[in-house]
Amino acid sequence: MAAMDFAFSLNKRSDSSCIVVIGTDYERNIYVLDIVRYKTKKTSVYLEKLADMHSKWNFQWVSCEVTQAQDTIVEYIKDELAKDKNGHAVLKIEDRRPGRNDGSKQERMAAALEPRYENKQVYHYRGGMITVLEEELVMEHPPHDDCKDTLAMAISSGKLRYPHRPQTEDEDDDSQEELARIAKAHTAHGRFGGYI
């Protein structure tokens, strides 16, 4: 699962565009696998960055917040990246359109992140852009919140899935076959044991 947040300004003080990739396990833990931040106004760069992350992690869904001009970018991504040469879906796009009833951006981030961090259900990798995310998480009013916002979008996605609990020796063979069928349908990530 991934989420993508768009920013249109190249100004140093403005937020950056961001992609966050997460994985999950059967205990409902969330693993931040990768983060990329960049500034651009070019639609082709949005596509290139997402294609690079998809190639690296092979996630099935990307959640994109769609407001104003972002709709055009998401449609471009759907046309260019979402299908292979045979027209089969390679990457599914979830359009997120926050409304008044969803609360402010800060309320949405708090609702998605605070309970999971309080329950110690979110794990970070070391180094790289994770330090930027961690700074945004601990500051009350960070100068930028693009990584935090994108992580909240991924975690609160309606497309986020958790794998089934591993089978024990006592459980019957039918449930083992069902687990094997489900496992084949999802991209496994060996380092963390969940799927993307």
Go through each PLM region and give its residues.
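RNase H-like, metal-dependent nuclease domains and their acidic two-metal-ion catalytic environment used
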Residues: 1-94, 122-196
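Conserved phosphate-binding/catalytic loops in two-lobed NTP-binding clefts
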Residues: 85-109
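Sequence-pattern detector for short linear motifs
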Residues: 99-100, 108-111, 119, 184, ...
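Short, surface-exposed amphipathic charged segments that create phosphate/polyanion-binding patches used
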Residues: 105-119, 137-141
